[in-house]
Amino acid sequence: MQFEERLQQLVESDWSLDQSSPNVLVIVLGDTARKYVELGGLKEHVTTNTVAGHVASRERVSVVFLGRVKYLYMYLTRMQAQANGPQYSNVLVYGLWDLTATQDGPQQLRLLSLVLRQCLSLPSKVEFYPEPPSSSVPARLLRFWDHIIR
């Protein structure tokens, strides 16, 4: 399933209007992903069919733009440390693999491993888009942490 399809599915899902905190967190990483979301590429694919769905999507979906992998790690660490912060049922991470593909080396691998561990330790359901190639290092790290944590 693609990012747009999954977000559309979450927007169309049954929202309880008495819920006070956001239900979905979308984390957008890197300039390319940010431009896609901000310049309307995403809006063309994700639409709401009802007024209630539109209101719910505005109130229940939070979007965070981050420029570096280390900022994602800091943000995830803060999310876990906040006991009374917003609780999300779903976290969609968009652009992580593209952002990490620009740099190689042990530092980047270590940081990616830390980020994946933090993501998969969240009580929320975390999904990564687009999915990494199955034989790539990020995909193997993702399978490793998924096996260890879940």
Curated annotation (Swiss-Prot):
Assigned keywords, A-Z: DNA damage, DNA recombination, DNA repair, Nucleus
Compartments (UniProt record) = Nucleus
What domain of life is recorded for the organism? Eukaryota
Q: Name one GO cellular component term.
A: site of double-strand break
User: GO BP, one example?
Assistant: error-free postreplication DNA repair
How the protein assembles, per its UniProt entry?
A: Component of the SHU complex composed of at least CSM2, PSY3, SHU1 and SHU2.
Q: What does this protein do?
A: Plays a role in a RAD51/RAD54-dependent homologous recombination repair (HRR) pathway to repair MMS-induced lesions during S-phase.
Name the record gives this protein: Suppressor of HU sensitivity involved in recombination protein 1
Q: Where does this protein come from, organism-wise?
A: Saccharomyces cerevisiae (strain ATCC 204508 / S288c) (Baker's yeast)
